[in-house]
Design a protein with these regions (language model features):
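Primarily recognizes the serine-hydrolase "nucleophile elbow" in alpha/beta-hydrolase
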Residues: 145-208
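Alpha/beta-hydrolase
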Residues: 68-71, 188
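The feature captures the conserved acid-bearing segment of alpha/beta-hydrolase catalytic domains
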Residues: 184, 193-266
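Loop/turn elements at helix/coil->beta-strand transitions in domains of secreted/extracellular proteins
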Residues: 63-67, 90-94, 156-160, 179-184, ...
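Short, solvent-exposed loop/turn and secondary-structure capping segments
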Residues: 55, 78-82, 105-109, 174-175, ...
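Cap/lid segment of the alpha/beta-hydrolase catalytic domain
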Residues: 70-142
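C-terminal catalytic histidine-bearing segment of alpha/beta-hydrolase fold enzymes
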Residues: 256-289
């Protein structure tokens, strides 16, 4: 609750619905997906003119489960169309979400009294919005919460999985700790704990190291919280030949401690894999399995 209060100034997640729902939205890039009934385009308005545009891929034949695919700083979820195709073909509803300011999301111009007019185009600019009462980290999590408010009841979702690549992988480590509606999280090339960030490039992403946030709960505690619960699981996959980031197996340093803590709590699973089957920064066939 302390984390939720930090983000929203409340003791609970947002209860509201998307501000706009466009049913049967047309995007020709996805016209060849098998088992696709339609795309619903969701718009979620937030403070400081920020918007999140989300695609909900509804299958013809549903299995009652939802996969949220969260893209990283590469932009649009079209980059992982193979992942969307894979799960849609198996009857999963699929939600495509992008990081703040990327893909179809808004890039507002903010007139700061202290700094002048600045167009927000890069996530590392978001810290400029920080005040004692407002924390821009919420922009990373609020779209998921609001989208789930609509989708879970409207489409009779029984189980929800969160899959994220890169920046989306970081989101996958953090968000399930805030929202127990996420049963399984699969983070690909997501993040290392702060004490294992050994290079200048490990500190490139503002959201990874906000001191006030991680003093409430550090990464090791997020691993536990996002794994904890009946039939809940957090899985991390790191690519040995990743061309972007976190191409290491440093999880071996803390993995046993997290598993020991979960054993003492009595429920929850934490797993890690080192994928050497693919060279690049994406979800491999091994990862999809």
């Amino acid at each position: 609750q302390e984390l939720i209060h930090y983000l929203w100034g409340s003791n609970e997640l947002p209860k509201r619905m998307p501000d706009k729902i466009e049913n049967n939205f047309k995007d020709s890039r996805y016209s060849n997906l098998k088992n696709l009934k339609q795309i619903n385009r969701l718009t979620i308005d937030m403070e400081h003119q920020m918007k999140s545009i989300i695609y909900f891929f509804e299958p013809n034949e549903k299995n009652g489960k939802l996969v949220i695919y969260h893209e990283g700083h590469g932009g649009d979820w079209i980059r992982e169309i193979d992942t969307i195709r894979h799960f849609l073909g198996k009857g999963y509803c699929v939600l495509g979400i992008a990081m703040p300011l990327l893909a179809f999301n808004e890039n507002p111009v903010i007139d700061f009294p202290e700094f002048g007019k600045i167009k927000l185009e890069f996530h590392n600019q978001l810290h400029l919005l920080e005040t004692d009462e407002f924390h821009p980290l919420k922009f990373y999590f609020e779209p998921i919460a609001v989208a789930l408010n609509y989708i879970i009841d409207e489409f009779n979702i029984e189980r929800t999985y969160l899959i994220g690549l890169s920046g989306g992988g970081w989101t996958t480590i953090i968000y399930p700790a805030l929202d127990e509606r996420i049963s399984h999280g699969y983070s690909i090339a997501g993040a290392n704990p702060i004490f294992l960030r050994l290079d200048e490039t490990d500190y490139f992403d503002y959201e990874h190291t906000v001191p006030e946030f991680y003093r409430i709960a550090n990464y090791e505690e997020f691993y536990v919280m996002s794994s904890f619960g009946e039939k809940r699981k957090l899985v991390q996959i790191f690519n040995k030949w990743d061309t972007c980031c976190f191409s290491n197996d440093l999880y071996k340093i803390y993995e046993a401690d997290i598993k020991k803590k979960l054993t003492s709590l009595g429920k929850g699973t934490f797993e890690n894999y080192f994928d050497d089957t693919y060279r690049g920064h994406k979800i491999s066939k091994f990862g999809l399995k």
